[in-house]
Amino acid sequence: MVMFKKIKSFEVVFNDPEKVYGSGEKVAGRVTVEVCEVTRVKAVRILACGVAKVLWMQGSQQCKQTLDYLRYEDTLLLEDQPTGENEMVIMRPGNKYEYKFGFELPQGPLGTSFKGKYGCVDYWVKAFLDRPSQPTQEAKKNFEVMDLVDVNTPDLMAPVSAKKEKKVSCMFIPDGRVSVSARIDRKGFCEGDDISIHADFENTCSRIVVPKAAIVARHTYLANGQTKVLTQKLSSVRGNHIISGTCASWRGKSLRVQKIRPSILGCNILRVEYSLLIYVSVPGSKKVILDLPLVIGSRSGLSSRTSSMASRTSSEMSWIDLNIPDTPEAPPCYMDVIPEDHRLESPTTPLLDDVDDSQDSPIFMYAPEFQFMPPPTYTEVDPCVLNNNNNNVQ
């Protein structure tokens, strides 16, 4: 019966564990070994890999595809390693043995580290401890890689614009149109940047519409001639209601790019893309949607001074908005306090509806008849005080 000798510790340690590597950079570290008893070691090997993988089930068919970015193998030596083919290292308890390693990542595009529902891009170093008459011991450690996406290129610094118009109908009867045109100053952004939106909206239908904007991520997986697409809404902003026969404009409405991974565009089996959707919610009808493509990069294209100025302006505006008026305001419109159960919006676009926290206005401009009491007449005279005065006179 063969008794397996236990290893106290066997691990891969990087010199800079928090570093995010790029193409052409050197990955360096060491493999450390500690034993519980005297152990003969034949070899310590490493295997470094970088691979993109996608996998999902399409009915009874398994859709699977892989793409290699990195493969590096090496046999490591101690600094005082015995020489010779049959020479082995005798490891003793109480000592810590370190095997150093280093390799360079390939030049050119690399897939950014990513983990999605149906695929991932992983980079790791796996170490193997070979011992005679013993099973091979393994240790694995992942490291992060980010492909450079420079948003300062002319293509990504160019403005992006689009416009769209939709005819609205009610019971097959034409009910006017809703149109939207929008523009952003550039296509490339990085996390923390503010997207300045310029848009014009026109509503000639009889309904109250609401303009909104959202940043959306699309994950596309490709394998065996099949495609799987997942879409996720990341952040959003909305404007004021637009009543019938009126227009509205956004002049620099801001939407911040949250902490997200850069775009992955150069991989043949996995893509991560982003879009700015500017859309108008039309109750009882499909939304009018503009899709402006975005590229999220790894190098900021907006100066810190611009961000600082925008932040300061936003702060000053917030103080203006919080000023308390000298005269008391009138009570809110009765329509504003109607329970949400009486409001209606057709869930024609689930992605854009799911994250909208509040419902929009009633469908038509003219008020429908509700089955509850009408509001009391507004007056600034307290009726209780008036009744007390009348009683005193009597």
UniProtKB/Swiss-Prot annotation:
PTM annotation, UniProt: Ubiquitinated; undergoes heterotypic 'Lys-48'-/'Lys-63'-branched polyubiquitination catalyzed by ITCH and UBR5 resulting in proteasomal degradation. Deubiquitinated by USP5, leading to TXNIP stabilization.
Locations listed in the record: Cytoplasm
Entry-annotated residues carrying Phosphoserine: 361
Superkingdom of the organism of origin: Eukaryota
Coiled coil: none
GO biological process: cellular response to tumor cell; keratinocyte differentiation; negative regulation of cell division; negative regulation of transcription by RNA polymerase II; platelet-derived growth factor receptor signaling pathway; positive regulation of apoptotic process; protein import into nucleus; protein transport
GO CC term (a single one): cytoplasm
Keyword field: Cell cycle, Cytoplasm, Disulfide bond, Isopeptide bond, Phosphoprotein, Transcription, Transcription regulation, Tumor suppressor, Ubl conjugation
Cross-link (Glycyl lysine isopeptide (Lys-Gly) (interchain with G-Cter in ubiquitin)): 212
GO MF annotations in UniProt: enzyme inhibitor activity; ubiquitin protein ligase binding
PANTHER family: ARRESTIN DOMAIN CONTAINING PROTEIN (PTHR11188), THIOREDOXIN-INTERACTING PROTEIN (PTHR11188:SF14)
Assembly information from the UniProt record: Homodimer; disulfide-linked. Interacts with TXN/thioredoxin through its redox-active site. Interacts with transcriptional repressors ZBTB16, ZBTB32 and HDAC1. Interacts with DDIT4.
The protein's role, per its UniProt record: May act as an oxidative stress mediator by inhibiting thioredoxin activity or by limiting its bioavailability. Interacts with COPS5 and restores COPS5-induced suppression of CDKN1B stability, blocking the COPS5-mediated translocation of CDKN1B from the nucleus to the cytoplasm. Functions as a transcriptional repressor, possibly by acting as a bridge molecule between transcription factors and corepressor complexes, and over-expression will induce G0/G1 cell cycle arrest. Required for the maturation of natural killer cells. Acts as a suppressor of tumor cell growth.
Family statement: Belongs to the arrestin family.
Name the record gives this protein: Thioredoxin-interacting protein
Native species: Rattus norvegicus
